[in-house]
């Protein structure tokens, strides 16, 4: 009888149910639920956050690439469009105007008898087939006798070298800005040059003219004589020292013409803080052109304005396709 009762009091084999009940204890169940909850929260929050920051980064990249569209730089034709005609000729200026450039840079040199021509020494040397001749070595009559068509075929109009006054008569009312790049040389160097330039600007009524030069003496003389005239100075690498010229060195100047490899974000910020504009020169290749756009310079001087205009249009299309919005 005792044996029978003992057998009935034994806990029957439950097939592992006890272990399962212990396995799913209240403590374990709470931890499991907490883990599941955290996983659900993570899956609910992380993907949206990831895509939010990913989209934000994409927008930042697009904005950096496309922000120049809010303030596009002036397209400045260096000596006109010298890919289609000889630089600083009426043909080159006409091609640039037809391309609807924003501005034209004119090289300004003075003859031995004091007449200002739209001419650079290197171009004179090509025309005259003389590697050492300078504009100041020749008189007005001698320069007027030179014929560009002898080295460049297919000219549209005059094949003669224009005076500065003739050049301004053609271009000053056709573009937003005219840059006069004044060259200092023998026999008179800076003597009287500022007044000669200002006199022609006044006669041509070129209110949109900018005068800049590598000679700070000349630039300061123009500022002193005509404070309302827009004046710039040049920043480049000093050929003697290999160092960059001082960036902020002329109070009355409103434009800083910078050799384009020297331009970076910091340079642009520093110049803008002084209420001056940054003009990049001379930019003739696609990669530097894109770089100038991304840096947000105010103007780009180029010998190939049509190429720069085409590049800007292509980038503009890309930006709009990527969802960039141009403020109006």
Swiss-Prot record:
The keyword Membrane applies. The keyword Transmembrane helix applies. One of its GO terms (cellular component) is membrane. Keywords: Glycerol metabolism, Hydrolase, Membrane, Transmembrane, Transmembrane helix. Residues 73-312 form the GP-PDE domain. It is a single-pass membrane protein. InterPro entries: GDPD4 (IPR044236), GP_PDE_dom (IPR030395), PLC-like_Pdiesterase_TIM-brl (IPR017946). Disulfide bonds: none annotated. Its EC number is 3.1.4.46. It catalyses: a sn-glycero-3-phosphodiester + H2O = an alcohol + sn-glycerol 3-phosphate + H(+). One of its GO terms (molecular function) is glycerophosphodiester phosphodiesterase activity. Expressed in rosette and cauline leaves. Belongs to the glycerophosphoryl diester phosphodiesterase family. This is Glycerophosphodiester phosphodiesterase GDPD4. It comes from Arabidopsis thaliana (Mouse-ear cress). The gene is GDPD4.
């Amino acid at each position: 009888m005792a044996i029978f009762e003992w057998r009935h009091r034994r806990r029957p084999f439950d097939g592992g149910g006890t272990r399962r009940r212990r396995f799913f204890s209240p403590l374990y169940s709470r931890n499991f639920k907490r883990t599941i909850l955290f996983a659900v929260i993570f899956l609910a929050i992380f993907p949206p956050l990831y895509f939010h920051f990913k989209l934000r980064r994409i927008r930042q990249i697009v904005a950096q690439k496309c922000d120049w569209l809010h303030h596009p730089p002036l397209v400045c034709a260096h000596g006109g469009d010298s890919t289609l005609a000889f630089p600083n000729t009426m043909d080159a200026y006409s091609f640039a105007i037809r391309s609807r450039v924003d501005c034209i840079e004119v090289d300004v040199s003075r003859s031995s008898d004091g007449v200002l021509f739209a001419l650079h020494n290197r171009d004179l040397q090509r025309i005259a087939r003389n590697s050492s001749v300078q504009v100041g070595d020749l008189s007005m009559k001698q320069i007027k006798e030179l014929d560009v068509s002898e080295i460049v075929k297919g000219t549209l109009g005059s094949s003669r070298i224009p005076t500065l006054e003739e050049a301004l008569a053609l271009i000053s009312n056709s573009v937003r800005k005219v840059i006069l790049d004044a060259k200092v040389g023998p026999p008179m160097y800076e003597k009287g040059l500022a007044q000669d330039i200002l006199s022609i600007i006044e006669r041509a009524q070129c209110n949109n003219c900018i005068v800049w030069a590598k000679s700070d003496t000349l630039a300061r003389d123009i500022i002193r004589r005509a404070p309302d005239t827009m004046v710039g100075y040049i920043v480049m690498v000093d050929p003697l020292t290999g160092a960059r010229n001082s960036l902020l060195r002329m109070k009355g100047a409103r434009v800083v013409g910078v050799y384009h490899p020297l331009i970076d974000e910091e340079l642009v910020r520093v110049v803008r803080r002084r209420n001056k504009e940054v003009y990049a020169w001379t930019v003739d290749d696609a990669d530097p052109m894109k770089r100038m756009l991304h840096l947000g310079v105010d103007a780009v001087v180029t010998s190939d304005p049509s190429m720069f205009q085409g590049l800007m249009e292509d980038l503009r299309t890309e930006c709009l396709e990527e969802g960039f919005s141009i403020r109006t």
